[in-house]
Amino acid sequence: IYSAHTNLDIAEGGTNSTLSNLLELNNVTGLFQTGETSFLGKIGYLKQEMTLNELANFVKEKLNLNHLVISGNKSTKIKKVGLCTGKGTDADFMQIAKNNDCQCYITGGLGYHDAQYAQDIGLCVIDGTHYFTEVIIVPVLCEYIKNKIPNVECVCSKINGQTLDIL
């Protein structure tokens, strides 16, 4: 059994890298510096400009979600995004994204006051959920392990760890 959390968020090739790859972002850089060469979160450019509504549907499709929560005007044009997998709703992270000219921030665990803050600073937010912004790493890790240790069977858990549901 292999289990990792924050170290996998920060690692190059970890959850934030995987989400930026999944969303096909270009010119990707780090969001929040945590060490000399390590960052939590990513900033990057979409292949093409989209409205918030279009981007939300794109994220929903890429994360295999039936629904998601957004904050902001659905017709806002988005070209540059910041992201932080898991519960990256820290106001500092959103402010860094805004200071770097991001029009949208993608994370999980968005709450009422987080959305209020984002609106106050003029930043759209897409909540891809804590679970679904992180579970995307499982097949990536499984493939990595298979390549590094070919004689060891690597089985990805099929258990859905999402604890919230919408009726």
Residue ranges and their predicted role:
Residues 1-167:
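Active-site catalytic microenvironments in core metabolic enzymes, especially phosphate/sugar-handling
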